[in-house]
Amino acid sequence: MKKRYLGLIGAAWLFSSMAMALTLDEAKQQGRVGETLNGYIAPVKQDAETLTLVKNINAGRTEKYQQVADSNHIAIDDVARMAGQKLVARAPRGNTYAA
């Protein structure tokens, strides 16, 4: 069952990073955002483009986490936390993350 969560979480992360002027990968590489253990990204830089990206990515993640939580009868915070732990663990060396 956990593999199912992780697959859905991975899909949420992928879809939430598509079709942005600044992509999530670009923002991470530039040190503009970082993953957090709570499953959401946090801004490192405070410019308008970065803040918009953070807002959009986190909104998309919230929707996907809620879908996973609803379909598995668990709390959204638990889904987000599992995703956050995975995303931080998978972050390439040099990427920013917050505890």
What are these regions (language model features)?
Residues M1-L8:
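Bacterial N-terminal signal peptides that target proteins for export
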